[in-house]
Design a protein with these regions (language model features):
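N-terminal ligand-binding lobe of clamshell/alpha-beta domains
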Residues: 1-123
Length: 123
């Protein structure tokens, strides 16, 4: 569903979580790009509560990394309930446990999933 600027302002979301099935869109794109200046008064943008999902192929809605997707949405929507969890650390442990990879390999996987923003924002 594509929303107009007017529809977005009518909703005025507290949080925006960007999907990645049609291409990756980092939170910084909405927060910093002049292409989105008309949206700067939205609560989510003013409060810097814009997040991006991990990259996922269009045909993989229920892949093994699905718990990461759920955690990002939960922490974005309810930061006070998940303040003790850092997604960037959870992701490393997840990859090590699920795939049996080293710390360095887990970091490479996190980067491939385009989740380095979680480190940058300490999310």
């Amino acid at each position: 569903m594509i929303l107009s600027t007017e529809q977005l302002y009518a909703i005025d979301p507290d949080v925006i979580v960007l999907p990645t099935s049609n291409g990756y869109h980092p939170a910084s794109e909405l927060l910093n790009s002049s292409d989105f200046e008309k949206l700067e008064e939205l609560k989510a943008i003013k409060n810097k509560r814009v997040y991006a999902m991990p990259w996922s192929p269009m045909n993989c809605a229920r892949r093994v990394e699905y718990p990461i997707d759920i955690l990002i949405i939960a922490k974005a929507a309810y930061p006070q309930l998940f303040s003790d969890i850092k997604v960037h650390k959870f992701v490393l442990d997840f990859y090590k446990d699920v795939y049996g990879v080293s710390e360095e390999q887990a970091k490479a996987l996190r980067s491939e999933q385009i989740l380095d923003w979680t480190v940058e924002y300490d999310f």
